[in-house]
Amino acid sequence: MESLSEGTTAGYQQIHDGIIHLVDSARTETVRSVNALMTATYQEIGRRIVEFEQGGEARAAYGAQLIKRLSKDLCLRYKRGFSAKNLRQMRLFYLFFQHVEIHQTMSGELTPLGIPQTPSAEFPSAKIWQTLSAKSFPLPRSTYVRLLSVKNADARSFYEKETLRCGWSVRQLERQIATQFYERTLLSHDKSAMLQQHAPAETHILPQQAIRDPFVLEFLELKDEYSESDFEEALINHLMDFMLELGDDFAFVGRQRRLRIDDNWFRVDLLFFHRRLRCLLIVDLKVGKFSYSDAGQMNMYLNYAKEHWTLPDENPPIGLVLCAEKGAGEAHYALAGLPNTVLASEYKMQLPDEKRLADELVRTQAVLEEGYRRR
């Protein structure tokens, strides 16, 4: 390939940098548009639910069953994202954020009715899209979900504006709410100084990270793929094979299984079904020493699995926390949720020994680390 002359190097660098800026900007705007349209759609669903409930006494009486029936029918169509809890959240979202303005779109001049005069506007679906896409939702969907927990309207508006002004992430917003930043600002004699003390914005989130937001994946019905480090992924793969090689009792159910508790998303590394014990086994891999917080998190997973994943004829689920540390390993079963000690004893007899699992964890780490050193 013929190299560029020195005289054209500066020109090449200019077009190279310009294309990178163009692509990066387009990706960022694409994610922003997906988020805004998704959030606007959920608000519109909430509006329709509220207006249906307010459509007369007959509908008001039926409203108690509306969300339950909608959830059942929509889940048949879309599989996920439309639980009764989510629909109630959409309803609340509309009630709390009716102030969102609708701006003029770029697709054409607006008619007196506010619908752009384009050929696509002849179709009802196009009109709906143009209305929704024009709504201004600059914050991520997860931020609005967190704001719903703020019951005081003034406080909610304050946190919304400060999140926009300061560029807070959801985690930073949660921290400000937890430390009562709004109340402290009200009580302060120098409110301007308080507002200048806001936390700095977190590092800019890349588009590929934003598009993996569970809310976005759920809305688009995309496969929930989770990016792990090569080492952790290899470790989980080996552990999965090792568990299945222990005998015919273990049946593989899934990996990186996602669950939502309140407004937070979690993932369990491996999920098995033990045929003889007739129960689910949740495996959680931790890098580092075992801590009480690991046990608490596993108990939270087990409570969720018992309510949402366990079938009526199955026994309560059990957990296995595997802790991998350089040159060491630990394995701990979580059996506290079982109804009696007899069942717990039976489980222990049927399950692989904790020491055997810990030894396998250490051996696997050594093999993988040796493989990486030889690359």
UniProtKB/Swiss-Prot annotation:
Keyword Hydrolase: yes
Deletion phenotype: Deletion of this gene results in a synthetic-lethal phenotype when combined with hypomorphic alleles of the replicative primosome (dnaB), DNA polymerase III (dnaN), and DNA topoisomerase IV (parE).
Keywords: DNA-binding, Hydrolase, Nuclease
Uppermost EC category: hydrolase
Pfam families listed in its UniProt record: DUF1016_N, YhcG_C
E.C. number: 3.1.-.-
Molecular-function GO term, any one: nuclease activity
Domain remark from Swiss-Prot or TrEMBL: Possesses a PD-(D/E)XK-like nuclease domain.
Record note on quaternary structure: Interacts with DNA processing enzymes, including the restriction complex HsdMRS, the integrases IntF and IntS, and the recombinase PinE.
Name under which the protein is recorded: Putative nuclease YhcG
Originating organism: Escherichia coli (strain K12)
